[in-house]
Amino acid sequence: MLIVVSPAKTLDYETPLPTSAFTQPDFISDSAELIKACRTLTPVDIAKLMKVSDKIASLNAVRFEEWSTTFTQENARPALFAFKGDVYTGLDANSLSESEIEYAQTNLRMLSGLYGLLKPLDLMQPYRLEMGTKLENGRGSNLYQFWGSLITNKLNQELEAQGSETLVNLASNEYFKSVKPKELKADIVTPVFKDCKNGQYKVISFYAKKARGLMARFIIQNKISNVEELKSFDSDGYYFVEAESTATTLVFKREEQNK
């Protein structure tokens, strides 16, 4: 069973690491090509393209300039411990055991606008480049065109290596659009998390992101190997709703929070 999640905008390069192990990303030469395109942008260009503040634009202009094709423990850190957003709050990687980190290294992948696909222990230099960014590049006018089938092909290799035919999609729509379902040699299962608000159950972004991380953690800690076992997910009060689920979409609900 292979899990894919989105990256996070917020990064953490300060917290002590729970492991000294690391690996190298698979698409460094492709990332270097994107960095080359990014280096042609001024901070003003970046602010406009990425819809970010001048401060964030300036920071990322510096990051693009400082980015190197040599990844070391001095200029990078393992991706799983570098991302710090709602998904990663739920995943809480720093509290995973060594054996759980090893399991994640085989079964968890992070989609990325700059790096394509990251393994948990892949060294990652800091960046901001969301998958939906309309960055002109040598392969097209956006990152979906840039990555083409590369991410899907890599996922197929990973699935074949572990003898799995199931991909659990815990990524956002923006990121999962970088995967080509028709070319993927696996069944895609997408968990959907609905929270009750004012008597209605709906997907609330903040809660759903954290729930995706909780589900990833649940799979890693319990070494889940089939879809049936996913249905027993009950972290933070979520419960499986058979009546609203299908073979490819698993619906989980939770009662209203902060009453």
UniProtKB/Swiss-Prot annotation:
* One of the protein's GO biological processes: response to hydroperoxide
One matching Pfam family? H2O2_YaaD
Signal sequence span is none
The UniProt entry, under InterPro entries, shows: YaaA (IPR005583)
One GO cellular component term noted in the UniProt record for this chain: cytosol
NCBIfam families registered for this protein in UniProt: PRK02101.1-1 (NF002541), PRK02101.1-3 (NF002542)
Family statement: Belongs to the UPF0246 family.
Which protein is depicted?
UPF0246 protein VFMJ11_2214
